[in-house]
Swiss-Prot record:
Gene Ontology MF term list: ATP binding; ATP hydrolysis activity; ATPase-coupled transmembrane transporter activity
SUPFAM superfamilies found in the cross-reference section: P-loop containing nucleoside triphosphate hydrolases
Official protein name in the record: Uncharacterized ABC transporter ATP-binding protein MJ0089
SMART domains: AAA
InterPro entries documented for this protein: AAA+_ATPase, ABC_transporter-like_ATP-bd, ABC_transporter-like_CS, Metal_Ion_Import_ABC, P-loop_NTPase
GO cellular component terms, A-Z: ATP-binding cassette (ABC) transporter complex
PANTHER family: METAL TRANSPORT SYSTEM ATP-BINDING PROTEIN TM_0124-RELATED (PTHR42734), MOLYBDATE IMPORT ATP-BINDING PROTEIN MOLC (PTHR42734:SF6)
Binding of ATP, residues: 38-45
CDD domains documented for this protein: ABC_Iron-Siderophores_B12_Hemin
């Protein structure tokens, strides 16, 4: 089995005459957590939507497990990619049923014992068993976010795409959600690609970083790319990096 699960090569995307992504090229290995960083409007969410075929690039190639996504129908893609959107709202549906919906790509005629088993397994993994019969519109933001991640996980994906998964969460839930993403990526050999605004959360839980600026990759690599020079260039903010108990912390200046 190849370690490489995602290859993005020369991807470009534009809204009418406005170029959003330009010659995007990178690769992701199984088990990696990759943070996509940059200011609002840099193209981060657009990139995730291109990988998930929500948007169609005007040029470039995206391979998932060596399959060109252009040749995958929505059902085939949903078996390979789990997508957690930026915003999720609860509704009058139990947590169990909301998570079970993620099995839709695998269900043929009716819900199988395996579908039920996997749903229970993922609920347990995310400590959601006690919430199974609660309605999603009764949940807190952090609880609902875990339900949406659980729904993506029951798809048994090879890749998780998460668009600002810690948005609107308190500090405790931010840490818990990111630790869940990191632990699941390692234990299940899933590649997780996460759009992030919080550099310190990204540094704490990610293996690799892709910094976008004006629709192009400005910097890519490990923790070494999160440095004062790149932060200044990408965000326009002066900062220094402090090491706290082995964890690098970005400290803005002024």
């Amino acid at each position: 089995m190849s370690l490489m699960i995602l290859s993005v090569d020369g991807v470009e995307f534009a809204y009418k005459s406005r170029q959003i992504l330009n010659n995007i090229k990178f690769e992701v290995k199984r088990g990696e957590v990759v943070s996509i960083l940059g200011v609002n409007g840099a193209g981060k969410s657009t990139l995730l939507k291109c990988i998930n075929k929500i948007l169609k690039p005007k040029r470039g190639t995206i391979l998932i497990d060596n399959f060109d996504i252009k040749n995958l129908d929505n059902l085939e893609l949903a078996k390979k990619v789990g997508y957690v959107p930026q915003r999720a709202e609860g509704n009058y549906m139990t947590v169990f049923d909301a998570v079970l919906l993620g099995r839709k790509p695998h269900i043929k005629w009716e819900v199988s014992d395996r579908d039920i088993e996997i749903t229970h397994k993922v609920l347990k993994l995310l400590n959601l068993e006690d919430y199974a019969l609660r309605y999603t519109n009764e949940l807190s933001g952090g609880e609902l976010q875990k339900v949406i991640i659980a729904r993506a996980l029951v798809q048994e994906p090879q890749i998780l795409l998460l668009d600002e998964p810690t948005n609107n969460l308190d500090l405790k839930n931010q840490l818990e959600v990111m630790k869940i993403i990191m632990d699941i990526s390692k234990s299940q050999n899933i590649a997780s690609i996460v759009v992030m605004h919080d550099l310190n959360l990204a540094l704490r839980y990610s293996d690799k970083f892709i910094m976008l600026k004006d629709g192009v990759i400005y910097a890519e690599g490990g923790r070494e790319v999160i440095n004062p020079e790149n932060i200044k260039a990408v965000y326009g903010v002066d900062a220094y990096i402090e090491n706290v108990r082995g964890i690098p912390v970005v400290v803005p200046i002024g």
